[in-house]
C-alpha cells in the first residue's frame, strides 16, 4: 500500500497565503457608478378623452396653450449646463514644548554626615512635539448634457437623470448626471446650471485602451498587497 505524504502545516499555510495574494493581485478595483437611478423614463400613456370638436386639444401631451414649455412631467427633457469649479485648501500645524527641572538638597544624618554634608538629587526632562500637514485639491468640469425627468416630487421639484455616451477611437466615454431641479431655476432656453441642482451627482468615466493603460497591472497589485511598507 502506498503511503500518502502530507506537506508540513507551515508549507501548507505558506502556499495558501501565496495563492490568496495572487488572487488579490488579479482582482480588479471595483468601479461602481455613483449615479444609481435609471438614466431615462417614459411618460405614462395619456388618458383617452373625447374630442371636443375644436382645433386645440387641452389634453395633448399635457401642454397648456398659454403656459411656457418648461419641463414639468415625467419624460420631459432638460439641458444641464455643467459648470463645476471647486478649489479646496487645508493646512494644519501643532507645536508643543514642555520642560521640567527638579532639585533636592537633603541633609545626611548619622555616620554619613562625616562623608557627605548634603545629598543632592536633581532631575530634568524635556518633551517636544511638532507636526504640520496640508492638502489641496482643484477640480474643473465644464460641458452640457440633456437629461430626462424621471420623477416629480410632491412639492413640484423634478428628479432628473441622463447619460451621454461617446465612442472616440475605440474608447467609449460616459457622462452621467442626476439630481433634483427646482422648476423656478429653469431658464427660458430650457436649461439650468449644475450649481443650482440639488443632490447633484456627476460622473465621467471611460472604457477602452486608454482606460486600461491607467489600470495597474496584476503583478504590480500582487506586490502591492504583500509589501510590508
Swiss-Prot record:
GO CC terms of this entry: bacterial-type flagellum basal body, distal rod, L ring; cell outer membrane
A Pfam family recorded for this sequence: FlgH
Signal sequence interval, chain numbering: 1-25
Keywords: Bacterial flagellum, Cell outer membrane, Lipoprotein, Membrane, Palmitate, Signal
Gene from which the chain derives: flgH
Keyword Iron in annotation: no
S-diacylglycerol cysteine lipid modification positions: 26
Biological role: Assembles around the rod to form the L-ring and probably protects the motor/basal body from shearing forces during rotation.
Domain of life: Bacteria
Name listed for the protein in its UniProt record: Flagellar L-ring protein
Amino acid at each position: 500500500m502506498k503511503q500518502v505524504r502530507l506537506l508540513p502545516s507551515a508549507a501548507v499555510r505558506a502556499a495558501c497565503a501565496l495563492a490568496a495574494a495572487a488572487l488579490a493581485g488579479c482582482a480588479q478595483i471595483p468601479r461602481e457608478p455613483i449615479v444609481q437611478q435609471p438614466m431615462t423614463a417614459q411618460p405614462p400613456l395619456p388618458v383617452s378623452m373625447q374630442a371636443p370638436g375644436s382645433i386645440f386639444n387641452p389634453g395633448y401631451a399635457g401642454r397648456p396653450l398659454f403656459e411656457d414649455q418648461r419641463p414639468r412631467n415625467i419624460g420631459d427633457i432638460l439641458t444641464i449646463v455643467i459648470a463645476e469649479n471647486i478649489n479646496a485648501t487645508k493646512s494644519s500645524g501643532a507645536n508643543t514644548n514642555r520642560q521640567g527641572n527638579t532639585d533636592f538638597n537633603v541633609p545626611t544624618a548619622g555616620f554619613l554626615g562625616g562623608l557627605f554634608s548634603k545629598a543632592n538629587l536633581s532631575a530634568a526632562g524635556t518633551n517636544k512635539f511638532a507636526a504640520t500637514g496640508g492638502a489641496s485639491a482643484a477640480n474643473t468640469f465644464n460641458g452640457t448634457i440633456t437629461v430626462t425627468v424621471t420623477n416629480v416630487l410632491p412639492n413640484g421639484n423634478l428628479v432628473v437623470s441622463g447619460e451621454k455616451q461617446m465612442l472616440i477611437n475605440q474608447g467609449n466615454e460616459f457622462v452621467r448626471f442626476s439630481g433634483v431641479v427646482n422648476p423656478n431655476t429653469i431658464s427660458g432656453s430650457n436649461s439650468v446650471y449644475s450649481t443650482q441642482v440639488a443632490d447633484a451627482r456627476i460622473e465621467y468615466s471611460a472604457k477602452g485602451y486608454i482606460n486600461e493603460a491607467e489600470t495597474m497591472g496584476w503583478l504590480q497589485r500582487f506586490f502591492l498587497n504583500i509589501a510590508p511598507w
